[in-house]
Amino acid sequence: MVRVTVRYRATVIWTRTGGADDGPLLVLLHGLGGTGELWRGLEALLPDAWAGGWVVPDLPGHGRSATASSYDFGVQAALVAEALPDDRDLVLVGHSMGGMVALAMAGRLDRVQRVVGFSIKTYWPAPHVEGMRGQSLKPARVFPTREEAVERYLLASGLRGLADPGAPEHAAGIREVPGADGGWRIAQDMGTFDFGVPDMPALLDDVSCPVTLARGSEDVMVREENYAGLGVEVVTWDGLGHNPHVEDPAAVVALL
């Protein structure tokens, strides 16, 4: 696997690639607060399950990617698309916010063959949106120790209780603050919390390829009725929560 950086309007998208150099390219898009490292368990299964290649980005303002001037789904989709080869058909897999980015990409790129989105929160009343916007205006908290910053990253990415705090891949989710009064903070740009008003029906209207939506039966953020009436295939994983790709990567691979 190699690291590839691509510049687009002064924004750098970090990616990791694997698999074959031809055939459909699987694009794995993490959720809010995460990094591409959340796909490690699923990637380990791909050599035996996916004949093409795959690419794992850190979304704008997350992990090792640079910040962006806006985190609207369409802007994120354009930035990620610029980091991908333009001669490959694409299959997009997105978790939570990454699922919205995947749908926005599919609405703009004719070469997207399929979208699999899971754990996508579709119910966004105005107070929720305003709460997220308010969060985006707060400075990132600086912690005196690296271990405390890792704990904050695990909370922000939904990994607390699911991942070993000592695992080396969490380094992608934090960064050291320079200076005499420095410390450690999460790498996520707080501006990423302001991504606008999610509109699943509008995103789906622009997509012409097949779409599968999935959720864990124990996911309190995404209920079965939230996916009702959207006119796409819906899969429910029994016993899984909001992070099925971490809890049971094989269940997600099975959808491919």
Predicted regions and their residues:
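Active-site loop/oxyanion-hole signature of alpha/beta-hydrolase fold enzymes
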Residues: 50-93, 254
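Flexible "cap/lid" loop of the alpha/beta hydrolase fold
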Residues: 111-146
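Conserved serine/cysteine hydrolase catalytic core
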Residues: 177-230, 236
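Conserved HGGG/HGGXW glycine-rich cap/lid loop of the alpha/beta-hydrolase fold
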Residues: 16-66
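Gly/Ala-rich beta-loop-alpha elbow adjacent to hydrolase catalytic centers
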Residues: 94, 98, 102
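The conserved beta1-alpha1 loop
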Residues: 29-31, 95, 215
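Conserved alpha/beta-hydrolase catalytic His-Asp/Glu region
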Residues: 144-198
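Catalytic histidine-centered segment of alpha/beta-hydrolase-like enzymes
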Residues: 240-249
